[in-house]
């Protein structure tokens, strides 16, 4: 069993979520100003070098908007911090990834891009299905202020 298997809340809700994501036909599409603006706003709020709008499918997280990770458009789901974030309704903040037992041996922490900090807010549809995240990343440990976390949640 991999990390991905441990974070899926239930097979039926995950199947419903994946079906809705496919129906939206947004994964693997071209950049759009709206999503780029969401990532830029998240970056400005948090003051981080990296901001993403991430969509999580069955095998990967794919970035609809990407600031700070040039040349990369996805990562395997089993490495995705966002796969954890979509399990809840609130912002997930990881203040020091190497010290967090969920992520200390994650290749995104131990290798490039060297994630130390992550905060992500789930993108939740009106019916409660979570499609992905608006997230920010830094290569240094830190903490956002409550108002910044709330603003990130509102963006999502």
Model feature map: region roles:
Residues 24, 36-45, 84-88, 109:
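Amphipathic alpha-helical regulatory segments at dimerization interfaces
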Residues 133-142:
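Short beta-strand-to-loop transition segments that serve as allosteric relay/switch motifs
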Residues 28-61:
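Helix-loop-beta substructure at the N-terminus of cytosolic sensory domains
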Residues 116-127:
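A short, aliphatic-rich beta-strand micro-motif
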Residues 20, 49-50, 56, 60-64, ...:
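Regulatory sensory and allosteric helical modules in signal-transduction proteins
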Residues 130:
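Glycine-rich acetyl-CoA-binding "A-motif" of GNAT/NAT acetyltransferases
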Residues 1-33:
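Signal-transmission linkers at sensory-effector interfaces
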Residues 144-156:
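Amphipathic alpha-helical "output/dimerization" segments
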């Amino acid at each position: 069993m991999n990390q991905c298997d441990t974070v899926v809340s239930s097979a039926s809700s995950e199947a419903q979520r994946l079906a809705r994501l496919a129906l939206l036909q947004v994964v693997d599409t071209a950049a759009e100003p709206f999503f780029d603006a969401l990532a830029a706003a998240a970056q400005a709020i948090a003051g981080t070098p990296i901001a993403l709008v991430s969509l999580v499918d069955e095998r990967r997280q794919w970035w609809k908007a990407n600031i700070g990770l040039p040349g990369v458009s996805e990562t395997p789901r089993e490495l995705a911090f966002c796969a954890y974030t979509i399990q809840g309704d609130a912002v997930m903040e990881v203040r020091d990834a190497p010290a967090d037992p969920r992520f200390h041996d994650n290749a995104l922490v131990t290798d490039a891009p060297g994630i130390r900090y992550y905060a992500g807010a789930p993108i939740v549809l009106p019916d409660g299905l979570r499609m992905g995240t608006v997230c920010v990343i830094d290569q240094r440990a830190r903490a956002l202020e409550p108002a910044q976390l709330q603003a990130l949640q509102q963006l999502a």
